Structure formats: C-alpha cells, structure tokens
Amino acid sequence: VIKIHILALSLLALLPATNALATVCVNEKGVPTEVHYDLTDKFNSSNNQVGQVVTLSEKSQWVGVNAVCPKGTVGNTTKRSYVTDYPVTGTSDGYQYLKLNDYLDGAMKITDSYAGAFYPPKNYIQMGSHPNVSKNKPFGVQDSSLIFRLKVTRRFINMVVIPRATMFRVYVTTTSSDPLTTPVYTISYSGIIQVPQSCAINAGNVVEFDFGDIGASLFSKAGVGNKPEGVSSQSKTIAIKCTNVEANAMLTMRVEAEKVSDNVLVSDNPDVGFIIANESGAPLTPNNLTSKIPFRLDDSAQAQVGIRVWPVSVTGNKPAEGRFTSRGYLRVDYD
C-alpha cells in the first residue's frame, strides 16, 4: 500500500513539469489581431446558379501580425494551425468549403513565405525559422495573398447579407503536440452579395399591422403562444413584382427576424410578440427555410400573396403596460 501511495505522489509531481514543456505562442500585443475580409460583391445572372464559384479580389498584403513565444522555447521553427467552428461541406481544387449561410459556402487559400499556398482549415502546418522564436521576442506571421471563394448552394433574390463572423482562429506553436489554446490572430468576414434578380415586396413600403389598445391582463390569461381573448387577427395581401426573374417562376415567401421565440416574433416588450401566418392561418416559423408560402409569378413576373398576423403572449406573464412593436422581414426566394 505504501508503494502505491508513493508512486501516485511521484506522478503528480511530474505533471507540472510536463505542462511547462508546451510552447504556445501569443500575439505580441497580448490579444488576437482580427484580419477582416469584406465579401461585398455583385454577382451576375450566370453566377447566381447552384454550384457556381466566384473568386473575390485577393487580399494581397501581409496580415501584419507578430507573435512571441514564451521564455524557454527551444528551437526557432514554428507551426501554425487554422481552426474553424464550421463543418467542411466539400473540397474542390484544394479549397475546403465551409457553410456561411443558407445560400453560400466559403473557402480560402493563404500563402506563407515559407510553406507556400495552403487551404485551411488545417492544423500544425510547418512554417519557417526566425531567430526571435527562442529569444522571447516578436517575429512576423508571414501570411499573405488571402484568396476567398464563394460557392452558391441555393439561388437567391435581391441580396444576401452576411453578418460579421469568425471563420478561422490561427494558433502558433513549436510542435504538433502543443495545445491550441490562445489564437494569435483571427480571420473574420462579412459583406453583402447582390444579384440582378430582384423582387419588390409591397412596392418597397413597410407592411404595418396596428392592433390598437389591448389589456395587459389579457395576455397572461391567454397563456404562452396564445392570442388574447377578443383580439382578431389581421389579414393583408402583399404585392410582389420581380425583375430579371423568369415569368411564371415558382417562388416562396418566408419570414426573417432578429428576436424570435419558436414561431413568435418577440417585440420590444419581452412578454409580447406576434405570429405571422399564411392566408389560411398556418403560422410561419421565422428564420426557417422550410417554413414558407409558395407562389407562382404571372406572365408579368408579379404575384399577390396573403398573410395573417396576430399578437400572442410570449411568456404567459402579465406584460408591462405601454406601446409595443416588433419588426420582421419578408424574404422572397426561389422554390
């Protein structure tokens, strides 16, 4: 028994020494640098087809990032790892495509002064040597010539807004066994992709529904997801007119919103929201590609689509008294 206890103590004593051998280099400024790629572009009609690939303008300059490795680092060579939270959807010409949204996949090629061209995500890529690596002094991360490709996975109308997001976190280490814990820099992206195919909804005007005054206690009595007693839904017919979209094309209309709880658009009063439904009263689920109203354009590339809206309780609680509003977006897509 005594020997077993001594052995356990010996192993514990060795653990700190093993961890101390890990070499994780960091940004010289103490925080990761963000290298941002603006994806804003205008596609032509032939680009807006499933499977089409568009290569964006090269971000040719050096990323401008310096790293520093900890004291006690042995050797002057480093490795870099490019880590993403997105799954790889496919590979073509070396490019590894990641899903950016419901319409576009994105992929990147990067060139290093030593390693040459490579296609992230990839871990522990062998890079060159710099005398400052072992001296606890800054050295350049020589990434340049960032080339971004977009692949259309679903045709779209008007535009796609791509919110700012991180595509890769870049780590610098000295061996392939070092943990990837502290990024030296990140590669982010955002932008707006426009296409010639467009549809004007309600002639570009806001579609408004005004339900007047509703007693606050009626929402708590109604319960979660239910309409207050005595309040009727409101219906409107939305005019749609398309340009550069073939006549008689099958399209869909769906709802997008920023604040959502299940199929409810949450208002600026968190206890109250609205449901948007088709003209038959079947609710639409916001931000869901499969929850949609199908329709066909006429010979003039126009259509009329009916929707219904009603207020509901989001939480089942009695809401604070006062005016409440909610905002959503109607989006037209190819079916």
Where do the model's predicted regions map?
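N-terminal signal peptide c-region/cleavage motif recognized by signal peptidases
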Residues: 15-19
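Cleavable N-terminal signal peptides
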Residues: 9-10, 20
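Bacterial N-terminal signal peptides that target proteins for export
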Residues: 1-8
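Intrinsic-disorder-associated interaction segments
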Residues: 1, 13-14, 141
